[in-house]
Amino acid sequence: IRVNLNGSMEPEVWTPASVAGLKQLATYAKDKNINIIVENHGGPSSNAQMLAEVMDKVGMENCGTLPDFGNFCIKREEGDYYSSKCLEEYDRYKGTKELMPYAKGVSAKSYSFDEAGNETRVDYPRIMEIVLDAGYEGFVGVEYEGSELSEEEGILATKKLLERVLE
């Protein structure tokens, strides 16, 4: 089950609340053979160092992360989680590396492509090297959030890019 760690934007409130909530949820899910996965998805959860600290404190095998290549905005103009302009972004490569030890899945986010089929915001060879160097062998989901291609075309372009990078 994928969850978000929303709530307070204040680390001293967010961290203990996140640990407590995840421990309770993961404990309930454990006997049911269910993994709880947290996506970096705005606010403090997009600060990979903080999210990794939460994962360390939870310390349960069935609780992990879903690193999303495109969700490292930690502060937005309007103070919201998703909609307004990003003012502060955590380094996506550093963040992915910090979240990979806990990864139960990976989200390959894409927005736009150049003429050669490369994603214009994310260096896919670099970020996939981080994923592979972590020893990850699980699923890589595709998430297209661009507007230049249809949803299907964007997903297929991302899949093609991943296949090329992983050759």
Predicted features, each with a name:
Residues 1-13, 32-45, 141:
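Active-site groove signature of glycoside hydrolases
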Residues 151-167:
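C-terminal helical cap(s) of enzyme catalytic domains, especially alpha/beta-barrels
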Residues 24-27, 133, 160, 164:
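A generic structural signal for well-ordered alpha-helical segments enriched in polar/charged residues
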Residues 103-116, 137-151:
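Active-site clefts of carbohydrate-active enzymes
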Residues 6-10, 72, 111-114, 147:
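A short, flexible beta-alpha/helix-coil linker loop
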Residues 11-15, 150-154:
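Metal-dependent catalytic neighborhoods of phosphoester/phosphodiester hydrolases
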